[in-house]
Amino acid sequence: MTGFRDQLGVHAQALVLRETRNNLLTSNIANAATPHYKARDIDFGAELARASGNGTLRTTEARHFAAGGPAARGEALYRDPVTPSLDGNTVEMAVEQMEFAENTLRYQTSLALLNRRISGLMTAIKGE
Protein backbone atom coordinates (compact mmCIF):
# COMPACT_ATOMS: atom_id res chain seq x y z
CA MET A 1 0.00 0.00 0.00
CA THR A 2 1.38 3.38 -0.94
CA GLY A 3 1.05 6.58 1.03
CA PHE A 4 -0.88 9.69 0.06
CA ARG A 5 2.34 11.54 -0.68
CA ASP A 6 3.39 8.80 -3.10
CA GLN A 7 0.09 9.19 -4.96
CA LEU A 8 0.76 12.86 -5.64
CA GLY A 9 4.02 12.17 -7.44
CA VAL A 10 6.57 14.92 -7.86
CA HIS A 11 3.98 17.62 -8.54
CA ALA A 12 3.61 18.67 -4.90
CA GLN A 13 7.38 19.03 -4.54
CA ALA A 14 7.56 20.81 -7.89
CA LEU A 15 5.00 23.39 -6.73
CA VAL A 16 7.05 24.25 -3.65
CA LEU A 17 10.24 24.58 -5.70
CA ARG A 18 8.49 26.64 -8.39
CA GLU A 19 7.20 28.99 -5.68
CA THR A 20 10.72 29.34 -4.27
CA ARG A 21 12.05 30.04 -7.75
CA ASN A 22 9.28 32.58 -8.40
CA ASN A 23 10.26 34.43 -5.22
CA LEU A 24 13.90 34.58 -6.34
CA LEU A 25 12.98 35.76 -9.84
CA THR A 26 10.62 38.48 -8.56
CA SER A 27 13.35 39.61 -6.18
CA ASN A 28 15.73 39.84 -9.12
CA ILE A 29 13.24 41.92 -11.11
CA ALA A 30 12.51 44.19 -8.14
CA ASN A 31 16.23 44.84 -7.67
CA ALA A 32 17.05 45.49 -11.32
CA ALA A 33 18.18 49.03 -10.50
CA THR A 34 19.98 48.23 -7.24
CA PRO A 35 23.75 48.71 -7.58
CA HIS A 36 25.84 45.59 -6.91
CA TYR A 37 22.75 43.34 -6.66
CA LYS A 38 23.52 39.81 -7.83
CA ALA A 39 20.75 37.92 -9.66
CA ARG A 40 19.97 34.58 -8.01
CA ASP A 41 18.23 31.41 -9.13
CA ILE A 42 18.05 27.73 -8.27
CA ASP A 43 18.90 24.69 -10.34
CA PHE A 44 15.34 23.40 -10.53
CA GLY A 45 16.20 19.95 -11.89
CA ALA A 46 18.82 19.30 -9.22
CA GLU A 47 16.54 20.60 -6.47
CA LEU A 48 13.63 18.44 -7.63
CA ALA A 49 15.85 15.36 -7.75
CA ARG A 50 17.12 16.14 -4.25
CA ALA A 51 13.60 16.74 -2.91
CA SER A 52 12.28 13.51 -4.38
CA GLY A 53 15.17 11.50 -2.95
CA ASN A 54 16.85 10.87 -6.29
CA GLY A 55 19.55 13.44 -5.76
CA THR A 56 22.13 11.21 -4.16
CA LEU A 57 25.27 10.99 -6.20
CA ARG A 58 26.83 7.58 -6.49
CA THR A 59 30.55 7.44 -7.08
CA THR A 60 31.98 4.34 -8.68
CA GLU A 61 35.60 5.40 -8.78
CA ALA A 62 37.82 6.77 -6.01
CA ARG A 63 38.99 9.58 -8.30
CA HIS A 64 35.47 11.04 -8.79
CA PHE A 65 34.86 14.55 -7.52
CA ALA A 66 32.84 14.89 -4.33
CA ALA A 67 29.42 16.50 -4.68
CA GLY A 68 29.13 19.33 -2.21
CA GLY A 69 28.63 22.54 -4.13
CA PRO A 70 25.90 25.10 -3.44
CA ALA A 71 23.36 23.35 -5.69
CA ALA A 72 23.84 20.10 -3.80
CA ARG A 73 23.06 21.89 -0.54
CA GLY A 74 19.88 23.53 -1.85
CA GLU A 75 21.25 27.06 -1.96
CA ALA A 76 20.39 29.75 -4.46
CA LEU A 77 23.03 30.23 -7.11
CA TYR A 78 24.21 33.51 -8.60
CA ARG A 79 23.57 34.02 -12.28
CA ASP A 80 26.40 35.24 -14.52
CA PRO A 81 25.22 38.05 -16.81
CA VAL A 82 25.75 37.98 -20.56
CA THR A 83 26.37 41.74 -20.53
CA PRO A 84 27.53 42.95 -17.10
CA SER A 85 26.50 46.44 -16.06
CA LEU A 86 28.85 49.16 -14.86
CA ASP A 87 27.25 49.36 -11.40
CA GLY A 88 27.88 45.66 -10.67
CA ASN A 89 24.23 44.64 -10.97
CA THR A 90 23.85 41.27 -12.71
CA VAL A 91 20.08 41.42 -13.35
CA GLU A 92 19.21 41.23 -17.04
CA MET A 93 15.56 42.19 -17.27
CA ALA A 94 14.81 40.25 -20.47
CA VAL A 95 16.30 37.06 -19.01
CA GLU A 96 14.45 37.48 -15.71
CA GLN A 97 11.11 38.16 -17.40
CA MET A 98 11.52 35.15 -19.68
CA GLU A 99 12.49 32.87 -16.79
CA PHE A 100 9.60 34.22 -14.70
CA ALA A 101 7.06 33.61 -17.50
CA GLU A 102 8.34 30.07 -18.10
CA ASN A 103 8.39 29.26 -14.38
CA THR A 104 4.84 30.60 -13.95
CA LEU A 105 3.58 28.49 -16.85
CA ARG A 106 5.24 25.39 -15.44
CA TYR A 107 3.80 26.18 -11.98
CA GLN A 108 0.31 26.35 -13.46
CA THR A 109 0.87 23.07 -15.30
CA SER A 110 2.05 21.30 -12.15
CA LEU A 111 -0.92 22.72 -10.25
CA ALA A 112 -3.37 21.47 -12.90
CA LEU A 113 -1.79 18.00 -12.87
CA LEU A 114 -1.85 17.91 -9.08
CA ASN A 115 -5.52 18.97 -9.04
CA ARG A 116 -6.36 16.23 -11.52
CA ARG A 117 -4.50 13.65 -9.40
CA ILE A 118 -6.33 14.77 -6.23
CA SER A 119 -9.64 14.69 -8.09
CA GLY A 120 -8.93 11.11 -9.15
CA LEU A 121 -8.10 10.14 -5.58
CA MET A 122 -11.32 11.76 -4.33
CA THR A 123 -13.30 9.80 -6.91
CA ALA A 124 -11.64 6.58 -5.74
CA ILE A 125 -12.33 7.39 -2.09
CA LYS A 126 -16.01 8.12 -2.79
CA GLY A 127 -16.28 4.91 -4.80
CA GLU A 128 -17.76 6.57 -7.88
Swiss-Prot record:
Keywords tagged on the record: Bacterial flagellum
GO biological process: bacterial-type flagellum-dependent swarming motility
Cellular-component GO terms for this entry: bacterial-type flagellum basal body, rod
InterPro entries: Flagellar_basal_body_rod_CS, FlgB
Major localization listed first in the record, in broad terms: other
Keyword RNA-binding in annotation: no
Compartment list: Bacterial flagellum basal body
Subunit description: The basal body constitutes a major portion of the flagellar organelle and consists of a number of rings mounted on a central rod. In Gram-negative bacteria, at least four rings, L, P, S and M are present, whereas Gram-positive bacteria lack the L and P rings. The rod consists of about 26 subunits of FlgG in the distal portion, and FlgB, FlgC and FlgF build up the proximal portion of the rod with about 6 subunits each.
Annotated NCBIfam families: FlgB (TIGR01396)
Family note: Belongs to the flagella basal body rod proteins family.
Function noted in UniProt: Structural component of flagellum, the bacterial motility apparatus. Part of the rod structure of flagellar basal body.
Protein name (Swiss-Prot/TrEMBL): Flagellar basal body rod protein FlgB
Source organism of this protein record: Cereibacter sphaeroides (strain ATCC 17023 / DSM 158 / JCM 6121 / CCUG 31486 / LMG 2827 / NBRC 12203 / NCIMB 8253 / ATH 2.4.1.) (Rhodobacter sphaeroides)
Taxonomic placement: Bacteria, Pseudomonadati, Pseudomonadota, Alphaproteobacteria, Rhodobacterales
Gene from which this protein is expressed: flgB
